């Protein structure tokens, strides 16, 4: 069975059996080379990434402690464990509508990083819009006046959002407070 048929057959990620089956499948040699790579992510967690459009994208979250895996992003670059309710829409006020629409569609075309797990949670940075240099060619043409927009949230070991994604406007103290909130929630 190819990987896409596997997901069609196992849509319900809440099903522990499906998560265990996915864990088994992702721990085969096929997902350790070529267009796939598995990297340690701290606390017995791992991220399985796939090359999509020439970039490594975090597709799956593996929890070695419980021998389960969860689809974080699908092959069409849509986030699977993040829902619209997991975004702090107030924090996005004042940014361009097309950027907000990327968040609405849960589009992960631009960089997204799942940082190392610490105290049961991982910080996720999700770039909704790159700065204008992203569009520049090797000769220096094509640059736009776009501003980078990146939002941050925190997830648990299953990829579920614990603290909503929000635009912190580079207020790193706010990010520290979000981490503390996530750790408090997860360790109740």
Sequence positions of predicted segments:
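Short intrinsically disordered terminal tails
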Residues: 1, 12-13, 184-188
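Short, aromatic- and cysteine-enriched interfacial helices/patches
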Residues: 1-8, 58, 176
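Low-complexity, charge- and small-residue-enriched intrinsically disordered regions
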Residues: 5-18
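Residue-level detector of conserved, function-critical positions
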Residues: 18-188
């Amino acid at each position: 069975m190819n990987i896409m048929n596997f997901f069609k057959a196992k849509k319900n990620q809440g099903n522990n059996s499906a998560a265990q089956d996915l864990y088994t499948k992702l721990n085969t040699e096929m997902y350790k080379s070529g267009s796939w790579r598995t990297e340690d992510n701290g606390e017995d967690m791992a991220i399985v990434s796939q090359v999509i459009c020439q970039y490594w994208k975090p597709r799956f979250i593996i929890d070695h402690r419980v021998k389960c895996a969860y689809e974080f992003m699908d092959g069409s670059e849509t986030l699977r464990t993040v829902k619209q309710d997991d975004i702090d829409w107030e924090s996005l006020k004042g940014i361009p509508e097309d950027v907000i629409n990327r968040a609405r569609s849960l589009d992960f075309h631009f960089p997204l990083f799942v940082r190392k797990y610490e105290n049961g949670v991982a910080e996720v940075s999700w770039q909704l819009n790159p700065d204008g240099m992203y569009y520049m060619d090797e000769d220096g043409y094509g640059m736009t006046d776009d501003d980078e927009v990146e939002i941050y949230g925190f997830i648990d070991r299953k990829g579920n959002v614990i603290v909503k994604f929000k635009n912190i406007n580079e207020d790193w103290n706010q990010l520290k407070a979000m981490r503390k909130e996530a750790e408090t929630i997860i360790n109740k």
